[in-house]
């Protein structure tokens, strides 16, 4: 009955774009916490029920408006150990509630946009490996690239103003602004500037929402200017989940730029501009001269400093020539190189050879950063010599081999698109020998003596190369299929960077 009542209230609030009433609904916080507020309560507060939890939320909001956090902690510290024991817990409770409630209008608009529309859902586009086929197609024809580190944190007031385009409830926005500034002041001893980074550890969901809102605002302006400056305008686009009010904002920007910046579209005109981004790192590539890239660089720095109140300097954007420098993107080193080939042509009775050298995008495994990640995880030392994993010596032999095998397969799966397999073979060698040394240490023996004592089939699955799996699954697989497997393969089921691969 309570769940049905919640859906009725959700439908009624949706008609008027009200979010403020959800702050005082218990199911909002139950949804945020998974098992209710008691999940985050201390042992002294196990007896709190739902009504008491909601009462705590109301008292916290009242106290926050009074701008005096000592009212509750001084008067209720003896009666209620919840307030006196952990002063930051109330901020965590409210921030988790805000994180759930502020997502409601975005979710409802997404559902309404999908209703009655036959939209094919390309789940493969969620894969970060789907970016590389795009790079392979476009980047060999480009000359220069700009490695961009998107600066953060943005000022909290800028974030609230950004949310005004999407959230129409003034009461909710006022409370959200008040909470962000009060929480920032409460943490001013650690972090001096009012930023969204203070939520990165205490409430990752709320941090990601604010950070994505900041990126959405930045890219909507950038996309508008990119389309205005291009000879080949963007004519269509799919459902952009982070661009719910993009077209409304574009109309507004069209008026602003037409009145105040009439020369910018011609100033930055380039028909061969491509842009990709993952998290806080992006790449801007062009076929034009370095002069145009420097103009974009100057514009982006001014955009961040003037519009978002984020300090940025020119060093955060590095412009390089694609044929001479490698791109460090998605834990791959990518570069454009010549691929010489000889083509034999036959015309009637005459035949001749043509030397053709098209550009090709090379993607290789970053061996030095990856060895650094393995050394940090205690699989090897700083120079790449395998060592035993002490924390796994108390496990069974099967569990030790299975865990090393899982890590090795995940890395091989992620770096399947590498042009050169030699670096990956070295990483596999480190993991395999680390596994052997871990087992030898467990059995109080040396690695050489342990390998002589066990059967060869003991490590058969661990030492099987990826190319062998094709032969095991398809015994009659053709030579062309095996050769294709030994080349670059992009798996479209990878949606995040492997933990050991994330060296940035």
UniProtKB/Swiss-Prot annotation:
Major localization class: plastid
GO function terms (MF aspect): RNA binding
Pfam families reported for this sequence: Intron_maturas2, MatK_N
GO cellular component, one term: chloroplast
InterPro entries assigned to the protein according to its UniProt record, in alphabetical order: Domain_X, Maturase_MatK, Maturase_MatK_N
Gene Ontology BP terms: mRNA processing; RNA splicing; tRNA processing
Keywords: Chloroplast, mRNA processing, Plastid, RNA-binding, tRNA processing
Subcellular location: Plastid, Chloroplast
Family affiliation: Belongs to the intron maturase 2 family. MatK subfamily.
Role noted for this protein: Usually encoded in the trnK tRNA gene intron. Probably assists in splicing its own and other chloroplast group II introns.
Protein's recorded name: Maturase K
Organism: Quercus cerris (Turkey oak)
């Amino acid at each position: 009955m309570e769940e049905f009542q919640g859906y009725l209230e959700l439908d009624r609030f949706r008609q008027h774009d009200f979010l403020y009433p959800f702050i005082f609904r218990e199911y909002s916080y139950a949804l945020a916490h998974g098992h209710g507020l008691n999940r985050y309560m201390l042992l002294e507060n196990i007896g709190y029920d739902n009504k008491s939890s909601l009462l705590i939320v109301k008292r916290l909001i009242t106290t926050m408006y009074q701008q005096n956090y000592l009212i509750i902690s001084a008067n209720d510290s003896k009666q209620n150990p919840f307030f006196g024991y952990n002063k930051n817990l109330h901020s965590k409770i409210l921030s988790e509630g805000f994180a759930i409630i502020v997502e409601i209008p975005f979710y409802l608009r997404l559902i309404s946009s999908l209703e009655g529309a036959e939209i094919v859902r390309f789940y493969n586009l969620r894969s970060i490996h789907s970016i590389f086929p795009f790079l392979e197609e476009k980047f060999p024809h480009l000359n220069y690239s700009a490695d961009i580190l998107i600066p953060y944190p943005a000022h909290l007031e800028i974030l609230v103003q950004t949310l005004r385009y999407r959230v129409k409830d003034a009461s909710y926005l006022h409370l959200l602004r008040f909470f962000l500034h009060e929480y920032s002041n409460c943490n001013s001893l650690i972090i001096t500037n009012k930023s969204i980074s203070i939520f990165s550890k205490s409430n990752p969901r709320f941090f990601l929402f604010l950070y994505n809102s900041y990126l959405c605002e930045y890219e909507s302006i950038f996309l508008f200017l990119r389309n205005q400056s291009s000879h080949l305008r963007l004519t269509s686009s799919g459902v952009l989940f982070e661009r719910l009010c993009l077209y409304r904002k574009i109309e507004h920007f069209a008026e602003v730029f037409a009145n105040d910046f009439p020369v910018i579209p011609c100033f930055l005109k380039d028909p061969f501009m491509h842009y990709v981004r993952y998290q806080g790192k992006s790449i801007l590539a062009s076929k034009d001269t370095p002069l145009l890239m420097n103009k974009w660089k100057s514009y982006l720095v001014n955009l961040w400093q003037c519009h978002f109140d984020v300090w940025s300097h020119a060093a955060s954007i590095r412009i390089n020539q694609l044929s001479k420098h490698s791109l460090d993107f998605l834990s791959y080193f990518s570069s454009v190189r010549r691929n010489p080939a000889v083509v034999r042509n036959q015309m009637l009775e005459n035949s001749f050879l043509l030397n053709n050298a098209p550009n090709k995008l090379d993607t290789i495994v970053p061996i030095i950063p990856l060895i650094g990640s393995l050394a940090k995880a205690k699989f090897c030392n700083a120079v790449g010599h395998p060592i035993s994993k002490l924390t796994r010596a108390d496990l069974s032999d099967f569990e030790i081999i299975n865990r090393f095998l899982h890590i090795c397969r995940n890395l091989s799966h992620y770096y399947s698109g590498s042009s050169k397999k030699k670096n990956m073979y070295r990483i596999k060698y480190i993991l395999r020998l680390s596994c052997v040394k871990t087992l030898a240490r467990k059995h109080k023996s040396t690695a050489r003596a342990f390998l002589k004592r066990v059967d060869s089939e003991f490590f058969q699955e661990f030492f099987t190369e990826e190319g062998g799996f094709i032969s095991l699954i398809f015994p009659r697989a053709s030579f062309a299929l095996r050769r294709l497997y030994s080349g670059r393969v992009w798996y479209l089921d990878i949606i995040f960077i492997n933990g050991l691969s994330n060296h940035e």
